[in-house]
Amino acid sequence: MQRSPQFVDGQFRNPVPTRQMVPGAALAMARTQLSREGRLRRSPVGRIPVHRPTAADWGEPPASGLRLTWMGHSSVLAEIDGHRVLFDPVWGERCSPFTWAGPRRLHPVPLALGELDPVDAVVISHDHYDHLDMPTVKALIRTGTRFVVPLGIGADLELWGVPAERITELDWHESAAVGELTLTATPAQHFCGRGLRGPQHTLWASWVVAGPANRVFHSGDTGYFPGFAEIGAEHGPFDATMIQIGAYSEFWPDIHMTPEEGLRAHADLSQGSPAGALLPIHWGTFNLAPHAWSDPVERTVAAAREAGAKVAAPLPGKPFEPADEQIVDPWWRSVALPPTHGWPSWPAVTPSADAFEVVR
């Protein structure tokens, strides 16, 4: 770790000063938590529908060579050019160090982990409990898969029983080969922290996975920063981006993106090309922020349509091919508390390269 340019004075750091929380946020958050209507809107009012993948979904290879299945939160199975990569798998009931306290899952996992066919690699973005789940990792050990993680996280995996030879740790801008795929750790603007361990002792990252014909980007958790354009210039364009658009707040603007910032990141990564699909992640599964439960996806779809960007918003567990036309069905509206003035209409805009501009 000491060799990393990100490791300074005994800690991993972002290139620019990054606030985990703005001054005075604790008191303001307490007031927000006391709002009855706010509490109601932060959770669904009905049972979240989930698609259980079947052989009909996964039985044949994707025609385009790329298929994504959002399992909820930031967990995504990417089938890319004949390989299977599982990002940030969290199958646990809570994202917490405790089984009896902490944010609880709002919908069941689409598929039991034991029913998931083996994957070629598990990729972890950082060590927070909603991205690195110990019971899930322990279950995946039995499959013989390889774990590709940022610097420092390998120690946790070894402690949990993952053989050292199946762990690959990477710094930003370093790559590893998995079959015909190249996995590259890329920058993110976030932080780490787990249990009672000292601060910033593991790195956080976004990820690029490139195959012979397709390439994807997974943001992990991050604030909006100029690095997206640099990643796009070096590794893009992408056939799909998986972008964090939930758990944002005015109380921590540096470490989580709003939906509109998520779209800006997608535009930067795409270098002005509207062809790649945006899959919103980090929403819907756990209640982690003061915003309404459905706001992240509502705002993302609205912003994407206005910009002429291709966006997918599938049910948890519903596979899709980013190359296909994406027809968004607002399934979440059936289980969310409607806004005071009703559900808004989305802009009906046809995607075009002219409408989709890189935001600087």
Please state what every model-predicted region is.
Residues W100-V148, G236-M242:
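Active-site metal-binding motif and surrounding structural segment of the metallo-beta-lactamase
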Residues A78, D88, H126, D133, ...:
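Divalent metal-coordination and catalytic microenvironments
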Residues S75-D81, A177-F238, P253-E261:
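Catalytic core of the metallo-beta-lactamase
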Residues Q2-P5, P290-R360:
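C-terminal regulatory/interaction regions
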Residues Q2-P15, L116, A121, R146-A155, ...:
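Cap/insert and terminal regions of metallo-dependent hydrolase folds
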Residues W91, A185-G211, W331-R360:
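Active-site-proximal loop/helix segment associated with metal-binding centers of metalloenzymes
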Residues M1-E115, V149-G220, D239-I245, R299-P319, ...:
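Metallo-beta-lactamase
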